[in-house]
Regions:
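Substrate/ligand-engaging "lid" and interaction regions
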Residues: 1-194
Length: 194
């Protein structure tokens, strides 16, 4: 969805049901135009088919992203379909996660360079630093992939990792970024290796 896409009011902290697209989806469940409408319709079909519990995992860069996703989707569905909202209370989990990996915006020159180097025609590549940390709250509705085998950290509470990232990592990235840029670096991890 992206960190700014949850339709949560900065003033009240509540999901904004009066958004025009959200209002459309509440009235037209079978013809959604928002992420909330599409997910709700998918969950409605899952419920109708008798399929079991499911986890919705947010990897967006905001604190308590699972709690934010839960608030947004539960408020939306509660306004659209009370029966589905009750089913979700019993069958859908929204774990929190923390992802640390810088992914700068991709520019047209980046796309051209990648395609020339690799002989590809990728119109939407994602550039990122080599470092990655992915911490996931172990709160899944019906089992989960063994992500820890590929480096993810599973935990009961992501909060300590989020606080560490904000207070230590983000501050040090900011402190290091300015002299690194002046030194010719365009990635913080490259400057740290020097």
């Amino acid at each position: 969805i992206t960190e700014g896409g949850y339709n949560i009011s900065r003033q009240s902290g509540e999901f904004m049901l009066d958004n025009a697209q959200v209002a459309h989806d509440i009235e037209n469940p079978a013809k959604p135009v928002t992420a909330f409408g599409y997910v709700a319709e998918g969950l409605r079909r899952r419920k109708a088919a008798g399929n079991g519990p499911i986890t919705i995992l947010s990897c967006d860069n905001l604190q308590h992203n699972g709690n934010t996703a839960r608030k947004a989707f539960m408020t939306f569905v509660g306004a659209q379909d009370k029966e589905l909202a009750a089913w979700m209370e019993e069958n859908v989990t929204f774990p929190n996660s923390m992802v640390d990996r810088i992914t700068p915006a991709t520019r047209p020159a980046d796309i051209e360079r990648l395609n020339a180097q690799n002989g590809t025609c990728d119109e939407a590549p994602v550039y990122c630093e080599d470092f990655i940390q992915w911490v996931v709250e172990d709160n899944f509705a019906a089992g989960r992939p063994a992500w820890e085998t590929v480096g993810a950290q599973m935990t009961d509470d992501v909060t300590a990792f989020e606080n560490m990232k904000l207070s230590l990592l983000n501050a040090s990235h900011t402190l290091l970024s300015y002299p690194s840029f002046l030194g010719g670096y365009r990635k913080v991890d490259a400057a740290m290796h020097d």
